[in-house]
Amino acid sequence: MMTDPKFIDVDGIRTRYFEKGSGEVLLLVHGSHFGTPDACESALDWEYNFDALAQSFRVIAMDKLGQGYTGNPKTDADFTMAATVKHAARLIETLGLKNVHVIGHSRGGYVVARLTLDHPELVRSCVIIDSGTLAPGPSKTEYIMKEAPKPRLSRESQRWCIEHYSFRPDHITQAWLDEAENIAKSTKYQETVRKMEDEGLKSKQFFTHLAVHKEETLNWIIQGKLTQPTLLIWGYNDPTAELKRGQMLFELIADANPNSEMHIINRAGHFCYREQPETFNQVIKGFVEKCAGSK
């Protein structure tokens, strides 16, 4: 169970995280972004993995900038992916960590990849999970999510969105929905929705900035700047970040980084780490132990 959350000040942002275990340090970074009308993700996304991984490692699961119970960006100019990456890096530094195995899902996968490029001195290895944000090619997310029931961000609508990201919706727990529903109702989160959706920061700034940032990130990968051991994990049945896009991303990484590999999890959608947690946890355990042994 993910209980006893901790809070720390990261450059003036009150940041929530969970911590358990000892040994090699794993930082778990969830997906989505601030102000999304689909589903409110948080550190609790890792509820199937946290305790299992903490049996072997020191595991830290964070709420990203403006998500979960972490504070919002301090200025409108910080409603960007670059600010999200910087916040995650500063959390590592504020906690006094180094040689961290960074593990990110979806938008969080983009965060850990870019963090590894920006701050290689902080990172021992990088794990990218079903990250349509980082992968080349168009996403199907907007097309699928436009059918979500209204009102958006209601408990029922969030369940629908998560189900349509998934191959096996039985991974959706009441505790997870409780968390998502409570976050959606918070004044803090409603402010991000207002800024991103109503005031147009999503289209005017977030996505335009992300397009430029992503192009730079992929170019750096092609140029061989991602040198840490890197693992891609992908759900074979992901309906939004399709496997073929994951394979395209792996080709870019593998051509430039010999210390890279990819693991495909069958009968799993976008939330492969929740839909097939035992398989996922074993893959992570093996990869981290191999990386730790090669120091």
Predicted regions and their residues:
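Conserved HGGG/HGGXW glycine-rich cap/lid loop of the alpha/beta-hydrolase fold
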Residues: 13-71
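Acidic beta-to-alpha connecting loop that harbors the catalytic carboxylate
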Residues: 32, 236-238, 267-269
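Gly/Ala-rich beta-loop-alpha elbow adjacent to hydrolase catalytic centers
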Residues: 104, 108, 112
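Helix-loop "lid/cap" segments that line or gate small-molecule binding pockets
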Residues: 158-171, 179-187, 207-211
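Conserved serine/cysteine hydrolase catalytic core
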Residues: 189-251, 261
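Catalytic active-site module of serine/aspartate enzymes centered on a nucleophile-bearing elbow/loop
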Residues: 256-295
